[in-house]
Amino acid sequence: GGAGFPTGMKWGFIPQGDNKEHYFVVNADESEPGTCKDTPLMMANPHVLIEGIIIGSYAIRANHAFIYIRGEVAHVISRVQQAIEDAYKAGYLGKNILGKGFDLELVLHVGAGAYICGEETALLDSLEGFRGQPRLRPPFPAIAGLYARPTIVNNVETVASVPSIIENGPEWFAAIGTEKSKGYTLYSLSGHVNNPGQFEAPLGITLREILELAGGIRDGHKLKFW
């Protein structure tokens, strides 16, 4: 999960048998300067993100989910909104999904682009219609999040990884990466490399290997710092 915190443990913090509304929120507010991994992921395959949201919402018993996205990325907003509409038409969202008795409404919320809304509690304030400001913790969102109800906030990459783990099993995922950092992640390379872009690779990959994925340093340039 985000910052390396185990996602399963985070989902497990949601109270059981509390008879309260639960919420599942995806933080797609990619606001760090130079960060550009969520945008290409959502453009390439928004459906895998929606599938992860459905699985996560079912796991924490949430019937309402949100994707919070920056207003500047109009092309991504259009792409994700179309994918949501496709999912509704296919019966993967809405009432009584696939006849299984599970309801899920998914809303794409377009933010105003405030940098601070990348922080999860400021994002929740913004979703509620207030100015985004970080909240004092505790309580944490899993106990009192959106509308003071139990809420999970995950980033795009985390949620999009869920379907492949469900399909292939936790042992498959744990076999990737290193002993202390299992799995894979997205790396963004820019600057003077031959093939700048985003690369999915195991955690623990070396800088040399990442540069090789990007085709190496361009002629006439040297690696100055990392």
What is each PLM-predicted segment?
Residues 2-131:
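Iron-sulfur-cluster electron-transfer modules
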Residues 77-203, 215-218:
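Hydrophobic alpha-helical positions that pack around
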